Amino acid sequence: MKKSIFLLMAAFLLITNACTDQFEEANTNPYEVSDESLQQDFNHVGAYYSSLLGNIFGHQIEENLVAESFADYMATPTPFAGGVNNTTYYIRWNTYWDRIYKDLMAPANQVIKIADEGNYTVFSAWAKLIKIMGVSRLTTYHGPVIYSNYGSTESTIKYDSEADLYNTFFTQLDEIQAVFAANKTYAGMKKFDASYSGDVTKWMKLVNSLRLRLAIRISKAAPALAKTQGEKAIADAAGLITSNSDNMTISLYGGKLYLSVICFEWDDTRMSAGMESFLVGLKDGRIGKYFQPATDAAVYSDHPEFPYKGIRNGASLVAKDDHTSFSKINESFKTITKRNYLDAAEVYFDLAEAALRGWTGAGDAKTNYENGVKASFADWGASGVDSYLADATSKPIDYNDPKSTGSVNDFVSRSTVTVKWNDADSNELKLEKIITQKWLAGFYNPNEPWADFRRTGYPKLPTVYKNDSSSDWGVIPQGEWIKRMPFVNAERTGNTAGIADATTKLGGPDNIATRLWFAPDKANF
């Protein structure tokens, strides 16, 4: 791992959003400042935050060809690299690590140093929170990662185990919340905060909601710790994100959404077959907000009342043009200005699961579940939520690829889940409903849905059709799914002893078939 400290110039900020050599985003940042004003109004520390927040998310390689594919939101019509690539479980691109360390962790440490030297405690706490926001995503890709020892000048940099990492996160969230609680009316962040306009009380809700997210994530691996931390999040007087007006969003700062570029400018991504199966089968009113109809009516002849068509992930593809008539994302994504990091719908679904697990204060599972669906429909401006929640018969549909020969790329739906809540159902079926709806609500924010799928097995997604996994990166048995991304090559060659230590902490080979600690192979209840 490169140990050099980034020297960032606050007068000229670039959000490093390039994901391939061809992907460039022009970001016009309204929060940039000039040299003359750097020492005024906190500019010398605050000017970094737009870049920090902007680099929490990945783009084409980090999301579209990893989490977005593995969570089965989007699929490619393009047979990249001869059709043998990430989407078929042969890993060719693995770059989220670099984004988090080069573009988030390094500058965040610089900001914390400046803030601590100037006794700007709120700015320091803010940067520490952003580090957790980013690294808590990265760990779901790889497992053990470098956190406590980041910035070390030792020849070997050791990784944090997942268990240690979550304990550190929770301790630091305590410290961050204490700073925020002591400074609720602080206004210094306002001009640099495109998420909450400097409202510290809303950042406090995010701290609690993030704590709840992490507690739910480790609820199978460390149930006692998860319960303690989840109940702490629920009980905190600052509250949780339970209104869409409090959703934590991250501005694109004048740039284009990566998914819009890939879909509309490159023509390289489409609706997944999994999304077609669930959205069409459940008669979901959000389908027209997420996607636009296919341009060839013949491809949706099996359900003409829902004119949408997806591509199976890991599909056997011959030519790109075969599937480009399938459903693109909605045109509205061209003008989107921000994206959700953590929203009310997710919080309600987490509370629903917490209620199933008996966590104090979580409330009623049914009410939370329905509130999660309602929050998602409202956030997307979709209609028909009441009839949707009352539907006890509609189920995900089987998939047919009309552009392939015979049954190539087809699948029979593994899921028979319905939407309507039934208190008489088992906790397992209730959990399937909760996670299925959490997945549907989490569209184009794939990190947590991919984590949920590996943790719970829900929703019951189709397997990839073409599995090209091999001994190069690990073999995924037929009928199973990828478990993680391997450690990056730069670490394998530049921090070999650190990787050996990390692999021990991983508890299995450094390949895509090794389960992560937060997603053990055990019953959900």
Residue ranges and their predicted role:
Residues M1-P30:
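Bacterial Sec-dependent N-terminal signal peptides
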Residues C19-D72, A106, Q110, P459, ...:
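Membrane-proximal, proline-rich intrinsically disordered regions
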Residues C19-N29, T76-V84, T139-I146, K395-D410:
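Short, compositionally biased low-complexity segments
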Residues E63, F70-A71, Y150, A187, ...:
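Residue-level signal for alpha-helical context at structural boundaries
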Residues N64-E68, F291-P293, P446-R455:
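Short coil/turn segments at secondary-structure boundaries
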Residues T76-G384, D423-E432, Q437:
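Structured, solvent-exposed acidic/aromatic patches
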Residues F377, G381-F525:
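C-terminal functional modules
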